C-alpha cells in the first residue's frame, strides 16, 4: 500500500481535510485499479456517504430537544463523527461540487437541517450562515487538535469542547441581535517598550 508523509508545511499550505479525502481516494484507486480520471466519482461517493450518515446521526441527536440543547447535541455529535469517521467527515465537510446534482442535494439537505437548528436559537439569514461557519470551524479545530494532540496539558478534550460549545451558545443571542462589536488592534504609544497592542471595541 502506498505511503504518504505530510510535513507541517504541507498541512499549513493546503486544506488538511481535502488532503485526507484525496489520499483515501488515491488508496481506493490503487486497490481497485481505477484510473485517475474516475477519482472524482470516488470523492463523490465518500461525500454522499458522509453527508447521509452525518445527517442521520444529527437527526437522532436532535430528537426530543429544542433550541440551545438541540444545537449542543448536534455539535457534539458532529465532533464524534469526525473523530470516528475522519475520511468520510472530511469528504462531507468539503464544498459540494457544483456540477454534481446528487452531491449538491445531499449538501443542501444537511445545510438546511443546520439552519433549521439555528433558527430555533433565533438566528436566520446571514447571521445563521455566519454562526454555522463558526460552529464548523470550532468543531473541526477541536478535532484537529485532538487528533494531533496539540493542546498541551489538556486533561479532557470532551470537557474542553463542551465548554467551548457553552460559550458559543451563550453568545448566540448577542450575535442574533446584531450587536457584535469588532475588536480592532490599535498600536499603543509604548509599543516599543514591549507592551504590544491594546484593543478597543466598536459597534458594527
Predicted regions and their residues:
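C-terminal peripheral helix-coil segments that are non-catalytic and often amphipathic
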Residues: 2-6, 10, 116-123, 148-204
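Alpha-helical structural segments
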Residues: 6, 10, 23, 37-60, ...
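HTH DNA-binding helix-turn interface
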Residues: 15-19, 29-45
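Short, well-structured alpha-helical segments
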Residues: 21, 25, 72, 128-136
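Amphipathic alpha-helical core segments of compact helical bundles
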Residues: 29, 136-140, 144
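Hydrophobic alpha-helical connector segments
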Residues: 45, 49, 59-87, 98-99, ...
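Short linear capping/connector segments at secondary-structure termini
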Residues: 91-99, 149
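Amphipathic alpha-helical packing segments from all-alpha helical-bundle domains
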Residues: 97-125, 129-134, 159-170
